[in-house]
């Protein structure tokens, strides 16, 4: 069967369009070059990064006031100079094993989309000014956090979108 005959058949054309849409939605493997400053931090043995413009400050972890009936990623509230901020542990959202907070950890204060929060991290590594190339991750690799994972760089750091992260519906206290 030649292509003209195949495209003339409405059923075949529908199947081809459905397959093309499925393939287009599945592959996010293109590379994107970015020249923004990135802040690198660790969670466990893994490196992560986000745009440095979203970072406000880095503080020592002291205490957190737990909240009842919230997602495991919401540890509770921290007091930052009189402001109460949600303290978030990204491990449950990224499929990493839970870790009990300890004094050697840091709070990375981030702001995006009008929301400010404290991310619990092992350590802040650096702010890097050089251009990077992000390799977009397939949705299957990014898992359920795919909406706020921008890609992975050549050093295998997963780059996060702070706006998508802070607007994730799982991080909204509803009760």
Predicted feature descriptions by range:
Residues 1-175:
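An acidic, low-aromatic, low-complexity terminal/linker signal
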């Amino acid at each position: 069967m030649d292509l003209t005959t195949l495209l003339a058949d409405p059923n075949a054309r529908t199947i081809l369009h459905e397959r093309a849409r499925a393939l287009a939605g599945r592959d996010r493997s293109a590379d994107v070059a970015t020249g923004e400053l990135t802040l690198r931090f660790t969670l466990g043995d893994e490196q992560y990064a986000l745009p440095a413009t979203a970072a406000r400050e880095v503080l020592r972890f002291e205490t957190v006031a737990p909240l009842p009936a919230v997602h495991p990623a919401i540890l509770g509230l921290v007091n930052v100079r009189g402001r109460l901020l949600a303290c978030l542990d990204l491990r449950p959202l990224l499929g990493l094993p839970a870790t009990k907070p300890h004094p050697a950890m840091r709070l990375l204060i981030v702001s995006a989309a009008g929301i400010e929060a404290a991310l619990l991290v092992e350590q802040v590594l650096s702010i890097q000014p050089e251009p990077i190339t992000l390799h977009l991750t397939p949705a299957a690799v990014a898992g359920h956090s795919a909406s706020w994972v921008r890609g992975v760089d050549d050093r295998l750091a997963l780059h996060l979108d702070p706006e998508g992260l802070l607007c994730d519906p799982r991080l909204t206290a509803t009760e």
